[in-house]
Amino acid sequence: MTAGTEIALYLIQNLGTLLLTLIALRGMLHASRANFYNPISQLIVKITNPLLAPLRGVLPAKGRIDWAVLVMAVLIQIIILLGIAWLVGERWSLPNPLTLVGWGIIGVLGLVTNLTFFVLIAMIIISWVAAGSQHPAIELIRQIAEPIMSPFRALLPNMGGIDFSPILLFVTINIVQIGLRHA
């Protein structure tokens, strides 16, 4: 692999993952019904709107699911996969389109589980360090984490003032990640 190919591969992977992360965060903001007037939410919306606007007319959001975000995330993941395949010389041995869509869905699910993991870690650290803070980032993390945590809190309520539900969520995230690795 030449230096130019390696640089191009690095850029495709990292810039593609950054864009995919912003799109996934936009979907998580919508699903959690986070405050869209939060400055960080506004930044994510302004960055992702040019990509999502063409799909909005065809795929409107229904309830907590933003279909335009889901389709765009899978498309970006497929473009990343095709770019990597093209760079490493696998231009002519690409799988059929349904397999590519499957890989795209698995990639997006993997990213969302990783984002959920990091949101949960951030939520735990914030609860120790800055429990009462009103910083926009902290508020956004709380708003994203609460809908994810609430079903686990119902299964495992506080015991003596200590919340053990994140442990159950960590176990669930790990099970999902193992399943995605073997899909």
Stretches found by the model and what they are:
Residues 1-183:
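Selective transmembrane helix interface/packing segments
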